[in-house]
Amino acid sequence: MDYLLQVKVGALVGLLLLTLFFGFIPARMKWFHVTGGTELHKAVLSFVSCFAGGVFLSACLLDIIPDYLSDIHGELQKRDLDDGFPLPEFIMACGFFTVLILEKMVLSCTEGHRNEETAPLLAPAAPNGHAHGHPSVNDLEGSGHHVHVDFHAHSSFRSFMLFLSLSLHSVFEGLAIGLQTTNAKVLEICIAILVHKSIIVFSLSVKLVQSAVKPLWVVLYVTVFAIMSPLGIGIGIVVIETERQAGGLIQAVLEGLAAGTFIYITFLEILPHELNSSERPLLKVLFLLCGFSIMAALCFLG
């Protein structure tokens, strides 16, 4: 096993264990059983989410997209497929729209069942920015995800569809790690994904606990969510390690889909969710710049 493969396997195991760790913290600590949390709790999650947004922004613009464009242009030139159509950018757009359409399908499905359930899954926001009724994930500013969910609506089908959507996000995130060809890039993207996933799984676990979901279901949801990024890493490793004539082109296309997913996560989830809030805007921008600057420095030094 070469060193790069060892690094990817280490990232796979580390991402799995740390995601499980952050997901199970709320289930074990009484502090998180208090509905609504504290202002300090919300502020810390919000600042960490902004930092993660900066990390993702830097990884997108300075590393993932440039490397993908270089790889895909090289593969297209080998096969004389460069006919003037912006195919590389189109592939990225496909990754972006795949995640967007998936999420909207899930939300439409839950909306279609709204009248059949006692409690709605998507809690409408009040004018002051807070939802009436049961708390939603949106109440935690640092959740890192913009899907506003009321887990007290205990339809097993709707809960499964929601976590399926989040889990597919994670598969594409892990895919970006598995497709990398250098140790530094694997570690850089792994850090970004780890910060992002930890915030999401932590916040979702808090709301599951506060909504009196059975402990067994909390464990199941957290475990399924945790294994999705490692699954994506494994798929990427298989693609890289499989020697076939079209392997380079397949790898480049998957890199483009993963890049589109990163664009979606950064620009439609983390940044709007945090920066649209009027609370502590300058501090949020500061944490955003810190995350971006650290990853930019790593790119420069690497």
UniProtKB/Swiss-Prot annotation:
The chain crosses the membrane at residues 7-27, 45-65, 87-107, 159-179, 186-206, 220-240, 248-268, 282-302. Residues 28-44, 108-158, 207-219, 269-281 are cytoplasmic. It is a multi-pass membrane protein. The keyword Transferase does not apply. GO terms for cellular component: endoplasmic reticulum membrane; plasma membrane. One of its GO terms (molecular function) is zinc ion transmembrane transporter activity. It is found in: Cell membrane; Endoplasmic reticulum membrane. GO terms for biological process: zinc ion transmembrane transport; zinc ion transport. Ubiquitous. Highest levels in ovary, high levels in heart, eye, kidney and brain, moderate levels in intestine and low levels in gill and skin. Belongs to the ZIP transporter (TC 2.A.5) family. Transporter for the divalent cation Zn(2+). Mediates the influx of Zn(2+) into cells from extracellular space. This is Zinc transporter ZIP1. It comes from Danio rerio.
